[in-house]
Amino acid sequence: NYDNKAMRAAMIADMKFWVTEADIDGFRCDVAGMVPDDFWIEALAELKKIKPDIFLMAEAEGPQFHTDGFHMTYGWSKHHIMNEIAKGKALADRMDSIIVNHNTVYPAGSYFMNFTSNHDENSWNGTEFERMGDGAKTFGVMAATIPGMFLLYTGQEVALDRRLKFFDKDSVVWLDNRNFTQFYTTLIQLKADNPALWNGSYGGDYKRIDTQHEKIYAYTRTLGDNKVLVILNLSSDAHDAVLNTDSGKYKNVFTGKKQKLKAGKKITVPAWGYVVLKQ
């Protein structure tokens, strides 16, 4: 009952306890959208007085949570579009529209959590392999390279392919799945090493690249001299694409090889293929 001032004060006191006594880094606030905004405004301001660099995440989506004082919100709309694209029910235009909209309506510097799986999705809606099939890695590349902070959920680094029980102990079997372990290691290192992919106001600009094919989604992230070009085939068939971007010399992140890119030259991207190039 958020009309009860004593209850509000007690909740804020409990949150402050964990900051002052345990020196925690921050909070993930569950189901934040079912709590009044004015409570968050008061509570988060109090926490920031104690620890100015505290990190605050809302399990919710919407610009109002950033206005309330949260640093990061869930990228649910992007996640749902990934699932729809995987089923052939949506095109990359939808993802591009969401990103452009976020850049317009959210406060500058907002963080968005991008993901292909999390504890709710895995248990209730299925693993990324159930929902995204052979596109699981492709959408993993997307989640790690579009604007936002990338979530790696329990077991994804070893290709966990079953739903974990939500309310009972259900341990992950840590298989030696080096294919996926190396895949996510490469993505995490890519994000760490390239300022263009950093989060919030620290990261670079996003720009969609015309490919002359609705199933091939390409974009750049650029900050100063640092540029990352991502090319994704969001379908189960190979397709040709013509990139409307500048010619240049790049390094292929996944092969480690140098690669020249010529503007207007046709390239073939295999089914659910992904190419990540950096300068």
Describe the residue ranges of each PLM region:
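Solvent-exposed beta-hairpin/edge-strand motifs
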Residues: 244-257
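C-terminal beta-strand-rich structural cap/linker in extracellular carbohydrate-active enzymes
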Residues: 261-279
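Active-site-proximal helices and loops of the catalytic beta/alpha 8
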Residues: 14, 20, 30-112, 142, ...
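Aromatic/acidic polysaccharide-binding cleft in carbohydrate-active enzymes
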Residues: 110-178
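Active-site-adjacent "subsite" loops/lids of carbohydrate-active enzymes
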Residues: 1-22, 32
